[in-house]
């Protein structure tokens, strides 16, 4: 991205918001030279998967030949109930994952994208069977089955992209909201993939197939995947898949990327930004750049915390900031997943604990004198251990059942890699995140209410119409 100027509008939740999920399947069985040429799902006659030869498309930057399927994505058709169920799954899984990650990151800042991670794993789930599918459904809080689940994610993706718009402000600067999502499938060129699996990816996720050769050119395949991720994330995630992550046993990589760029409905005046003290989670005092403005924000409070919601232009997406009282951050943070049933509670979607409490507390608008630090950081994390801890165990072992992907070889997940980036300034937010799953074989007061965010806080970037949790994290040190 070019250096930011007044003519380059900022993205929601930070300088840039992007989430990418990559899944690589690695074979545990024998090799075969058979290829997939065409596949048609009888349930979806409008979708035809046609795989051209690897020479069809060449990535000039990496000299890797990529064959892309000509896939037709179905129009969104899920009911509102199913759409909200998919969004609830993202929130329930997000708070579960937050609980695990916060215990492994210490006092550090944290950001990740439940939306990106769940979408990528939903694509993986399309090829799962037996106990592997059951564990994934429980861990991801899926309460829909079969086509209904994947159609719900298709409709949710369309709902998120429908908020996009761009306009010029009174000074002639471009402002707006941009949420861009993309899915792709990278497969070993001589592996026969099941047609129903490919059709589901095509119809409900818009994911084409790129044929690569990890058996003899794993590094070139890695470079091609990273180039695609970098392009989808405006170069915020330049190298999602690290060296050595792909090898001759790699058979499949599923990638999801989300990029969010949005302008505040009420921008902060840069002239009002001053240095200010911020007490970190470790108890140290650092000097942060503190933005300040008075505006009518949705505001609420509960036991030991206050919440304020900063909407982006259009009013459909917002960043909610939950600010625990001084000395109560750990206590309040522990309530984030208080109501979440975890991997064993599959009877109903989680209520999300603290997030839902904060949302319910928000009034229509309260005049708030808000002081908020600017921040910019990224989180890189391997999610294998976290997913196993949440109940998704068999997917990573030799007993994994991904026979819905291919009958030719036995596949299991070897790792899940996630990277997220977020930046928040006076104009708005931009964020980026990437995940790779690697598979082996109330009333307005007379005076403004003052809220000075000078201590650790939790943030949730949400789509207000569906409740989809796009980004979730915490800021314990805005200068880190």
Q: Where on the chain are the PLM-derived regions?
A:
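N-terminal secretory signal peptides that target proteins for export/translocation
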Residues: 1-9
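Detector for small/aliphatic-rich hydrophobic stretches
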Residues: 3, 16, 20, 26-214
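Short, ordered coil/turn segments that flank beta-strands lining enzyme active or ligand-binding pockets
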Residues: 26, 281, 426, 464-465
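Charge-patterned, phosphorylation-rich low-complexity C-terminal interaction regions
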Residues: 39, 335-337
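Non-catalytic, conformational "gating/processing" segments within enzyme and secreted inhibitor domains
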Residues: 61-64, 107, 145-333, 352-445
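Conserved structured core elements
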Residues: 87, 91, 111-115, 130, ...
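Extended hydrophobic
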Residues: 254, 306-322, 446-480
């Amino acid at each position: 991205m070019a250096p930011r100027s007044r003519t380059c509008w900022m993205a929601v939740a930070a300088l840039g918001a992007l989430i990418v999920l990559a899944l690589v399947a690695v074979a545990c069985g024998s090799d075969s030279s058979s290829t997939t040429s065409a596949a048609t799902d009888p349930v979806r006659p409008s979708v035809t998967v046609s795989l051209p030869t690897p020479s069809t498309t060449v990535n000039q930057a990496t000299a890797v030949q990529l064959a892309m399927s000509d896939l037709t994505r179905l129009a969104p058709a899920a009911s509102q109930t199913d759409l909200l169920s998919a969004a609830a799954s993202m929130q329930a899984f997000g708070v579960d994952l937050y609980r695990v990650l916060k215990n492994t990151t210490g006092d550090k800042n944290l950001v990740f994208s439940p939306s990106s991670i769940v979408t990528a794993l939903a694509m993986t789930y399309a090829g799962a069977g037996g106990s592997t599918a059951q564990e994934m459904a429980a861990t991801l809080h899926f309460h829909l089955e079969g086509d209904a689940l994947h159609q719900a994610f298709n409709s949710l993706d369309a709902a998120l992209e429908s908020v996009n718009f761009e306009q010029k402000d009174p000074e002639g600067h471009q402002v707006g909201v941009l949420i861009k999502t993309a899915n792709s499938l990278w497969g070993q060129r001589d592996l026969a993939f099941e047609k129903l699996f490919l059709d589901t990816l095509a119809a409900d996720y818009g994911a084409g197939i790129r044929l690569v050769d990890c058996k003899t050119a794993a590094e070139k395949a890695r470079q091609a995947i990273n180039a695609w991720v970098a392009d989808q994330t405006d170069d915020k995630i330049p190298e999602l898949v690290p060296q050595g992550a792909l090898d001759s046993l790699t058979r499949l990589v599923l990638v999801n990327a989300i990029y969010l760029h949005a302008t505040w409905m009420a921008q902060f005046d840069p002239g009002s930004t001053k240095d200010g003290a911020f007490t970190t989670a470790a108890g140290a005092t650092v000097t942060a750049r503190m933005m300040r403005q008075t505006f009518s924000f949705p505001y609420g409070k509960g036991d030991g915390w206050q919440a304020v919601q900063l909407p982006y232009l259009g009013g459909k997406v917002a960043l909610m900031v939950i600010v625990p009282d001084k000395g109560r951050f750990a206590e309040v943070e522990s309530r984030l997943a208080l109501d979440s049933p975890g991997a064993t509670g599959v009877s109903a979607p989680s209520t999300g604990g603290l997030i839902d409490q904060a949302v319910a507390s928000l009034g229509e608008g309260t005049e708030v004198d808000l002081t908020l630090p600017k921040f910019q950081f990224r989180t890189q994390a391997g999610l294998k251990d976290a997913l196993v801890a949440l109940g998704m165990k068999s997917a990573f072992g030799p007993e994994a059942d991904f026979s819905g992907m291919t009958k030719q070889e036995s596949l299991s997940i070897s790792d899940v890699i996630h990277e997220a980036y977020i930046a928040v300034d006076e104009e708005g937010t931009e964020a980026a995140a990437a995940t790779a799953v690697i598979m082996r074989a109330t009333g307005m007061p007379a005076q403004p209410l003052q809220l000075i965010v000078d201590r650790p806080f939790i943030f949730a970037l949400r789509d207000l119409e569906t409740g989809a949790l796009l980004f979730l994290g915490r800021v314990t040190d805005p200068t880190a």
